[in-house]
Amino acid sequence: MRHRRALLFLTGAAVFVSALTAAAITGGYRLNLTPSEPLGLWRIEQLQRPVAIGDLVFLCPPSTAVFAEARVRGYLRRGLCAGGVAPLIKTVAALPGQRVEITDHVHIDGRSVPASSVSGTDGDGKVLLPDSGGVVPPHHLFLHSSFASSYDSRYFGPVPDSGLLSLARPVFTFHP
């Protein structure tokens, strides 16, 4: 009798958690567990206008060798985007036609981007090569995060805007 009650409780709890998760996903909520942006619950909001500098966005990266290597190194989580990675949550730092220069930190159109230091190695001591910079091509975005160890366009360069999913709005987030 005791085992049956425990089994019923666990089954009920599993069904409840599964239903809650499904409701959150279909309702446009996502859980961020990466340090590039605050941890916690985020809402997906459809973009009703052209993307702008400063927008915090969800974006699926392209399925390229650079992102495949990033997945192997553990920079990207597994998810439903092409290449089996989760969407990125990043801030749009530059739009097509803007000039990006990458030295020991990032400059966009001659202005220094705050919190954009470039590291030569990751947390495991593996070499990180910065992007070469240049003019952001048409239909591409240069993404940034102020988190020092963020894997963003400093390293992978501009990404196609075709991967843009939505705006990212924090609902219940915190900095650890």
Swiss-Prot record:
Annotated Gene3D superfamilies: Umud Fragment, subunit A
Keyword Signal: yes
InterPro entries for this protein: LexA/Signal_pep-like_sf, Peptidase_S26, Peptidase_S26C_TraF
Domain of life where this protein originates: Bacteria
Xref: Pfam families: Peptidase_S26
Cellular component aspect of the GO annotation: periplasmic space
Signal peptide: 1-23
Keyword entries, A-Z: Conjugation, Periplasm, Plasmid, Signal
UniProt function note: Involved in conjugal transfer of the plasmid.
Family: Belongs to the peptidase S26C family.
Protein name: Conjugal transfer protein TraF
Species this protein is from: Agrobacterium tumefaciens (strain 15955)
Name of the gene encoding the protein in the UniProt record: traF
